[in-house]
Amino acid sequence: MTITVSITRRATFAAAHILCRPEWDEERNDQVFGRCARDHGHNYVIEVTVSGEVNSETGMVANLKDIDGVIRRELIEALDHRHLNRDVEFLRGVIPTAENVAAAAWRRLEPHLPARLVRVRLIESENNSAEVVA
């Protein structure tokens, strides 16, 4: 019987953003996005979960060091202490909601991870998170 095991790695980054549509006036942006229609920041937590069979030689699904390297290279270096609307090329033209950032993170990570990506969870605050699942 084959058993599939999932492992999750967490990383953190701090970033600023604004939720707005430039073609809308301030009143409409405030109605839709509330206080988030003004520049503000978050201390984000991202959880990356991969899945696979446990390697009989190493006892691991994937080496966490390798997963850390991918997360750092593909996400943290691009996002940490940046303004998501202005500074991050892969978010250009996208409203950087938690949902959109989580989806973009999935697209960045998936081709580089050493095991099958099954979940990306972006925690924006203690009350807000977005999750992309396979």
Sequence positions of predicted segments:
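Charge-rich, low-complexity N-terminal segments
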Residues: 1-134
